[in-house]
Amino acid sequence: METLTVKKVNEVYMTIDCDGGSCFELSDYFTFTVPGMQFMPAVRNKFWDGKIRLFNAQTKKIYSGLLPHVQKFCDERDYKLEIDPAYADEEFSLSEAGRFTNTLDLPFEIRDYQLDAFAHAIKKKRALMLSPTASGKSLIIYLLAAYLNKKTLIVVPTISLVQQMAGDFKSYGYQGDPHMITAGVEKETDNPITVSTWQSIHKMPKKWFEQFDVVIGDEAHLFKSKSLTSIMTKLIGTPYRYGFTGTLDGTLTHRLVLEGLFGSVEKVTTTDELIKKGITELPCIGDGRQSGTSGSPSILNASPESATGGGLAWLKTGDTIVIDLNNY
């Protein structure tokens, strides 16, 4: 039986010790074609083949977050995998999570799935949390930041979400104001919590990112792949890495890249389960300007302009529609 050995390089990459044959297999296994690549100038001009290779057969490096996929690769081929002890889970139980949250003066009771997600994230140290609209993911983010109590960078896609996240933290009991970075705002701070748009920091030097022990990406599916990769690969010393997204459909970054940069997907809950539990903030049709985490969550966003003359043109305010959650 062939043995592959995983060794930690830093918080971004690991190496896989393999021979020529298995290295070729790994390279093929972790190679995918970028959707729409045939329309890209680099491909049309034959500067690039339109494929992304997550395993570098020369350096034998791959994103650390893809370790479970490497394990699956080995299981499918009856290869033995030896894993660096540095990737062992932390000891953190659900009861410990509950005891910690009881010490917080929160304005409402934590839902069971929020506690489960919090415990899972601390135990694994990295995860891509699939958390739909109205599931209260900003509270999970707050719990992570409060428990870890380390220099934390929270990255969001829009200015409105920077302000909303900071406001949510205040409402949960955070003392002081998180440092909010948008275009033109000072990026240096002693504040333990920094909330920024990815557009404001993706060109910052690697040295600037060395200060952070925790990185959390909210609405991760909306980040442009090149910018997200630029940010996350500069955080080579950041051990706690969490991505939050409401969907993995239509992401601007390939799912395997998201998992590689953050960690394995963990389903927090589903919209169907939220409604069955009687969550009052029921989904609605939005006008395309909602953040997706507001008090009036939308299961479908459609701008008035795009709806004019289209399939939604016959809908008017107050109309009732039926959504089949089995197909959502």
Can you describe what each PLM-predicted range is?
Residues 276-328:
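Feature captures the catalytic cores and cofactor-binding loops of soluble hydro-lyases/lyases
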Residues 151-158:
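Conserved RecA-like ASCE P-loop NTPase motor core of nucleic-acid helicases/translocases
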Residues 34-92:
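Interdomain "pre-motor" coupling segment immediately N-terminal to P-loop NTPase/helicase cores
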Residues 221-278:
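Post-DEXD/H (motif II) to motif III coupling segment of the RecA-like Helicase ATP-binding lobe
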Residues 160-184:
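Conserved helix-turn-beta segment of the N-terminal RecA-like "Helicase ATP-binding" lobe
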Residues 183-214, 225-230:
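Conserved helix/coil segment N-terminal to the catalytic DExD/H
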Residues 123-148:
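Walker A/P-loop
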Residues 84-130:
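Conserved pre-motif I regulatory segment
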